[in-house]
């Protein structure tokens, strides 16, 4: 038996991003395989509206993401652009923002801790 799920990244429904409890303004996600109940393992699609900003957080495990559309900016002014694949190691802390909006495919290996 084949257990398979196919997700078209450009044909999904987004809900408010509430990974830390309350929704974060201007951020929306579609959980593909991400689940807090399994230790925060899995993948989700994240959409950020123009001027949206993530909450400051610490990575308890690896977080990797691929910028599909737009740009994302970290506090050190590093700009992640379309096609960039970014890896944050456990213990990394940051928050990110976008000026014009972005679409990101996120691969999680642990639950982020809000700061």
List where the protein language model places each region.
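Short acidic-glycine-tyrosine-enriched beta hairpin
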Residues: 74-94
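Conserved short histidine dyad/triad with adjacent acidic residue
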Residues: 29-59, 89-93
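A short, N-terminal "cap"/entry segment at the start of jelly-roll beta-barrel domains
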Residues: 1-40
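Short glycine/proline-enriched turns and hinge-like loops at secondary-structure junctions
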Residues: 40-41, 58-60, 78-79, 98-100
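Ligand-binding loop in jelly-roll beta-barrel domains
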Residues: 90-115
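Solvent-exposed residues in well-ordered beta-strands and their adjoining turns
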Residues: 49-51, 73, 109
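Glycine- and acidic-residue-biased ligand/ion/polar-headgroup-sensing regions
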Residues: 59-75
């Amino acid at each position: 038996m084949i257990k398979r799920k196919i997700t078209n990244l450009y044909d999904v429904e987004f809900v408010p991003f509430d990974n830390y409890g309350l929704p974060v303004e201007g951020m929306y996600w579609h959980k593909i395989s991400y689940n807090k109940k399994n230790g925060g393992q899995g993948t989700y699609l994240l959409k950020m509206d123009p001027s949206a900003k993530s909450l400051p957080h610490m990575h308890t495990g690896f977080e990797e993401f691929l910028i599909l559309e737009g740009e994302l900016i970290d506090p050190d002014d590093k700009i992640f652009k379309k096609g960039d694949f970014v890896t944050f190691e456990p213990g990394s802390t940051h928050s990110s923002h976008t000026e014009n909006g972005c679409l990101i495919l996120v691969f999680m290996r642990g639950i982020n801790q809000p700061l």
